């Protein structure tokens, strides 16, 4: 039976899944394609699951035009697991065991902190007072002896997004794309490693996709756990340990949906339309809504803002959130570390969903503006 309550989910991840995908999952849940069992109980060694994981990998390759000299693996541990896996696999590429990190928000800061356990970390720019911009790349102090350069393409907490691929002078470039993966086309050949948790743009929680260039396999530190070792996972076709089968299946279905809806280029177009709708209201509100991020670095995925003034009027913000829930719009509360409001507009969030939020924001503004 279809759920009767229609809620718009602006959650930062886990996030909204396409309705058609949810219905298909529901339909196949008890009996997957006439096999008489659910994917939830299917052996990861079966030929049926081999087709599922093969299909998911092929769709990643097709949608991002992944070159043949890259492996695509599906692992557990989330983005946070990759904060350890990246240095464990790559920091030993050069004798000095050092890495360059660009820190533009909470997630790249966590990644840099984790990497310090395994080698020397160089933050390539002076520490930012607040996470509201991307430091000018011409000022970055890259270490030519670094094993890799790391950045986070989109910071979900602070709403800061790279709209360019940094030029790192031929160094191995590593990117956390968890929150804007497949929201736009990407030239994979510019990267050594790309990783992304599925639970924002491409599926449900539990699986992380890692795209790694072949020549970077086999350099893991001696102390690298086998489950985090890219060479081990790639050599076992992501079946070294029991993978998150159901999450891989859901991801495959979401990728199919993205493909059927025009691919990464169409997602990019939609993301610009959706985010623009909200930023316009913020910018035309005469300071009632305030987004702290510098315009050129604003995220299409996560829009953080305060209400009333730059520091936020907590009573107004509470009223905004309560009223939104009454109107069946959920998960608009900002991250606990920054407060305020945050609207996450991932691939499955429709323009109609965003129009509903935009209309509410206009209405709320009119009711409370002096």
From Swiss-Prot:
Pathway: Amino-acid biosynthesis; L-serine biosynthesis; L-serine from 3-phospho-D-glycerate: step 2/3. GO terms for molecular function: identical protein binding; O-phospho-L-serine:2-oxoglutarate aminotransferase activity. One of its GO terms (cellular component) is cytosol. Pfam families: Aminotran_5. Pyridoxal 5'-phosphate binds at residues 79, 107, 156, 176, 199, 241-242. Its EC number is 2.6.1.52. The modification N6-acetyllysine is found at residues 51, 127, 269, 318, 323, 333. The modification N6-(pyridoxal phosphate)lysine is found at residue 200. Its cofactor is pyridoxal 5'-phosphate. GO terms for biological process: L-serine biosynthetic process. It comes from the Eukaryota. Binds 2 pyridoxal phosphate molecules per dimer, each cofactor is bound at the monomer-monomer interface and forms contacts with residues from both chains. The keyword Acetylation applies. The keyword Cell membrane does not apply. O-phospho-L-serine binds at residues 44-45, 335-336, 342. Gene3D superfamilies: Aspartate Aminotransferase, domain 1, Type I PLP-dependent aspartate aminotransferase-like (Major domain). The modification N-acetylmethionine is found at residue 1. The modification Phosphoserine is found at residue 331. NCBIfam families: PRK05355.1, serC_1. Belongs to the class-V pyridoxal-phosphate-dependent aminotransferase family. SerC subfamily. Involved in L-serine biosynthesis via the phosphorylated pathway, a three-step pathway converting the glycolytic intermediate 3-phospho-D-glycerate into L-serine. Catalyzes the second step, that is the pyridoxal 5'-phosphate-dependent transamination of 3-phosphohydroxypyruvate and L-glutamate to O-phosphoserine (OPS) and alpha-ketoglutarate. This is Phosphoserine aminotransferase. It comes from Mus musculus (Mouse).
């Amino acid at each position: 039976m279809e759920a009767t309550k229609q809620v718009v989910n602006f959650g930062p991840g886990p996030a909204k899944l396409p309705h058609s995908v949810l219905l298909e999952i529901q339909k196949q849940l008890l009996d997957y394609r006439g096999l008489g069992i659910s994917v939830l109980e299917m052996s990861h060694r079966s030929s049926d699951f081999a087709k599922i994981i093969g299909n998911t990998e092929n769709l990643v390759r097709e949608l991002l035009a992944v070159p043949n000299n890259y492996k695509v693996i599906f692992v557990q541990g989330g983005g946070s697991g990759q904060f350890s896996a990246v240095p464990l696999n790559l920091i030993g590429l050069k004798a000095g065991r050092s890495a360059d990190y660009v820190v533009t928000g909470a997630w790249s800061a966590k990644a840099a902190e984790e990497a310090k356990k395994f080698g020397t970390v160089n933050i390539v720019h002076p520490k930012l007072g607040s996470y509201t911009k991307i430091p000018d790349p011409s000022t970055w102090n890259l270490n030519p002896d670094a094993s890799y350069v790391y950045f986070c393409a989109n910071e979900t907490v602070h709403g800061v997004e790279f709209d360019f691929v940094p030029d790192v002078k031929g160094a191995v470039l590593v990117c956390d794309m968890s929150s804007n993966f497949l929201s736009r086309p990407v030239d994979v050949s510019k990267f050594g490693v790309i990783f992304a948790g599925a639970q924002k743009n491409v599926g449900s929680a539990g699986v992380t996709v890692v795209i790694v260039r072949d020549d970077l396999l086999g350099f893991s530190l001696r102390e690298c756990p086998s489950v985090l070792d890219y060479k081990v996972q790639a050599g076992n076709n992501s079946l070294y340990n029991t993978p998150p089968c159901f999450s891989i299946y859901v991801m495959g279905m979401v990728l199919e949906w993205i493909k059927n809806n025009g691919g990464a280029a169409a997602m990019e177009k939609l993301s610009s339309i959706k985010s623009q709708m909200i930023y316009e209201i913020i910018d035309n509100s005469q300071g009632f809504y305030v987004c702290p991020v510098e315009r050129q670095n604003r995220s299409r995925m996560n829009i953080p803002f305060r209400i009333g003034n730059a520091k936020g009027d907590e009573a107004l913000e509470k009223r905004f959130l309560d009223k939104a829930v009454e109107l069946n719009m959920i998960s608009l509360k900002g991250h606990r570390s920054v407060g305020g409001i945050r609207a996450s507009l991932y691939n499955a969030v429709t323009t109609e969903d965003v129009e509903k939020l935009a209309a509410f924001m206009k209405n709320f503004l009119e009711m409370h503006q002096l």
